[in-house]
Amino acid sequence: MAQPIIMISSYPPRLCGIATFCEEAREFIQKAHPERDVLVISHTDGEGEGVFPIIDTSHRTWWKPVAQKIHELDPYVVHIEHEYGLYNYIDERGKSDENEGLLNLLEAVSDVPTVMEPHTVHGRLTDFEADFIFKMSRRINVVLFKCHYQKWRLDWNFRGRDWPTPMNVMVVPHGARPDRRYSLAEVVQLREDLGLDKVEHLAPHLVGLIGWIQSNKRWDILTSMWEDIAHEINERTGEDWDLLAAGTWRDPNHKPDYDRYRSEVELLEQKRLAHYYEFVPRGDVYYKTMAVCDFIVLPSTDETQSGTLARIIALNKPYITTAPMEGLTAQTLESGGGLLFTTRDMLRRHVIELACNEEARLRMGENLKRYLDEVVSWEIVAEQYSQAYELARESTRTGIPVELPKEF
């Protein structure tokens, strides 16, 4: 029997962006490797076939049973999804081990081909982040960054500290589904599926604020201006446009933001200018809720890359997002499928511009279709993962570190 591919990550039903990412990535990695099982070693709340829920970071030595399970399964490769909070042990004093347990795990499985996919790599690294990436990159065969700027900024960050730059970094973009494009007729049906056809005042055209409600997702920037924007659009085009705000909260720390944003939307709803739709942003309903919108606004104030944006791209939906904002800005420039704003006035202008210009929306949608088909489709990304796996296996076999060219 062929050796399995092992993913290490949080996993559903946990309401976590990395868990959702892993679930989707696993699907397409499995399609690319039908001869192998793709298994997951997850935290203790992970569930499902082929999932081993054994990561318990309440124990300092959580990594030991994980290393034992990896060796027991004898994998083709280990693929680790990384976010600092996922592998963080907190001692009885409330002190973090700063992912030391994860570094111990990498040393314990150094005989196994391993790649790691960090989901937070800032353009300007903190001392802690730089130290972790330095140590991690020396214990791993291949490091997978999401964006090209992260790789060339890493060189700048490390040279500024007089450190050697890791040469085993490969750029593999955040995957987006190639099978979630809907026709206009299907969008009408989706409104019915979601029950939106029963909202009497809901306009035929919708601007979407969709996804997890968090303090960094500043819905209030748009909601505070929406009444004026909607009137301006109507005066110019004679068309009615509404704001569709949809999602829910998952982090108790963000519940006050949820309450505030929702109350602002409900005030607009009383004026028949908006509608709030509560749902858990994962699975098909996430795509369907975005699909009924003409375009999406993603007003994020802190994000390196975005699962929400990946879904926007999958649907070929024009969008507006904040800049400069790490991967959001990079993918907007690369795709030509979105507009960027740095001020409230820019956001107002862009929303009105997109609502009044169907030709621009169609052009940006075509740009996103091309970007999806040629760059970020999960089918393409899964093949790039396969290339990384081969590099990791060859490095483990020969003992020669992977060395890839710099961006610049």
Task: Outline where the language-model segments fall.
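Conserved donor-binding/catalytic core segment of Leloir-type glycosyltransferases
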Residues: 7, 196-217, 223-226, 244
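A conserved mid-protein helix/loop that constitutes part of the nucleotide-sugar donor-binding site
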Residues: 19-23, 214-231, 256
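A short helix/loop element that forms part of the nucleotide-sugar donor recognition site in Leloir-type
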Residues: 181-199
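Nucleotide-activated donor-binding/catalytic signature segment of Leloir-type glycosyltransferases, i.e.
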Residues: 247-249, 256-284, 335
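Acidic donor-binding loop of glycosyltransferase active sites
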Residues: 287-304, 317
